[in-house]
């Protein structure tokens, strides 16, 4: 019996090794085109506006609000060692890399500093400790970092890309023999959205205009080197988010090369049997999440390709990707009954 099982295993393994790639040589050129249309990120230096206190408020979203304390310059001239904790407000939501500088005041620094930085999109995120978080998603997604500054003066740039408006800075450790300032805090905000969408007419209801501005800013921050499903968590391309964000882009930023890149990337990283996988993780190298085929997402890829054609008239790209769209229809048809 064992020799028979071994022989069968060997046969199936051999067949798998020689399995045909449904898209053949197309896959390589699709990935090359995806790389060709990878956008350059636009980097903008943003600085905090003010120091705030986060206080409970039953009428505010998630029961916390930010109350203005002082302009940011007041923090930069203040000895920080006895202050211990402070929260700053950038005045807008940003996606990018945060940095700050420290310098001693008076006596030379004779020891390192240690800070805890907590980043929040809304006031409640920096007000409520993360300690009680029960993991559903990875705890590592929560935006807090412990930073040790071994030498003063020094500029520290966090390696992690963050999505935030508020930053809470807590001093965890310092020498009692010198004091220091924190200064020159900034975020190098990034997006691939370079065009400026048209504003809604003044006659439109002010609330609708405000919703439109927030929606456009959200889309802008999701437009990185792919359409991310969220710049704070997950940070990857899903077909469902591609459909929604590309549709919004068609009527706002109109940067269709980003849509083209995503369409080619998904095609190039599809399963060997032609199935489109629902999600692509871009870094450190693009790769698809295996065995994640969703029928509705496969069809949304086709809808996105159609929307792209209507927005651009780019028939060459559509013909290039037609085998992918056709295959998704064939796959779905095999699982749909006549009724």
PLM feature spans:
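Bacterial Sec-dependent N-terminal signal peptides
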Residues: 1-21
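Extracellular/oxidizing-compartment recognition motifs
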Residues: 20-229, 257-260, 273, 278-282, ...
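Solvent-exposed loop and edge beta-strand segments that line ligand/cofactor-binding
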Residues: 87-90, 157, 227-239, 285-298
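Helix-terminus loop motifs that line ligand-binding clefts
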Residues: 125-137, 256-339
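Extended ligand-binding clefts on enzyme/binding-domain cores
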Residues: 235-244, 248-253
């Amino acid at each position: 019996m064992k020799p028979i099982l071994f022989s069968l295993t060997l046969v199936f393994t051999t067949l798998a090794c020689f399995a045909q790639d449904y898209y053949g040589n197309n896959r390589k050129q699709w990935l090359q085109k995806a790389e060709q249309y990878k956008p350059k990120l636009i980097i903008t230096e943003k600085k905090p506006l003010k120091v705030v206190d986060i206080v409970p408020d039953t009428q505010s979203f998630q029961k916390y609000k930010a109350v203005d304390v002082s302009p940011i310059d007041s923090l930069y001239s203040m000895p920080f060692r006895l202050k211990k904790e402070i929260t700053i407000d950038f005045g807008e939501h940003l996606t990018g890399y945060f940095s700050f500088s420290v310098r001693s005041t008076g006596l030379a620094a004779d020891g390192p500093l240690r800070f805890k930085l907590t980043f929040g999109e809304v006031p409640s995120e920096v007000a409520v400790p993360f300690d009680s978080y029960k993991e559903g998603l990875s705890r590592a997604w929560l935006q807090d970092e412990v930073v040790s500054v071994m030498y003063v003066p020094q500029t520290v740039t966090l390696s992690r890309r963050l999505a935030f408006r508020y930053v809470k800075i807590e001093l965890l450790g310092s020498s009692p023999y010198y004091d220091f300032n924190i200064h020159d805090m900034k975020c190098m905000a990034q997006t691939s959205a370079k065009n400026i969408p048209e504003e809604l007419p003044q006659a439109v209801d002010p609330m609708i205009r405000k919703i439109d501005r927030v929606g456009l800013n959200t889309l802008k921050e999701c437009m990185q080197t792919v359409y991310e499903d969220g710049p704070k968590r997950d940070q990857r391309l899903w077909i469902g988010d591609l459909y929604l964000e590309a549709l919004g882009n068609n009527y706002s930023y109109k940067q269709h090369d980003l849509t083209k890149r995503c369409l080619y990337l998904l095609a190039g990283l599809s399963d060997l049997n032609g199935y489109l996988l629902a999600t692509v993780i871009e870094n450190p190298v693009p790769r698809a999440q295996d065995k994640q085929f969703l029928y509705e997402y496969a069809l949304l890829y086709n809808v996105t390709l159609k929307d792209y054609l209507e927005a651009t008239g780019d028939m060459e790209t559509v013909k290039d990707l037609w085998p992918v769209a056709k295959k998704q229809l064939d796959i779905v048809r095999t699982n749909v009954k006549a009724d």
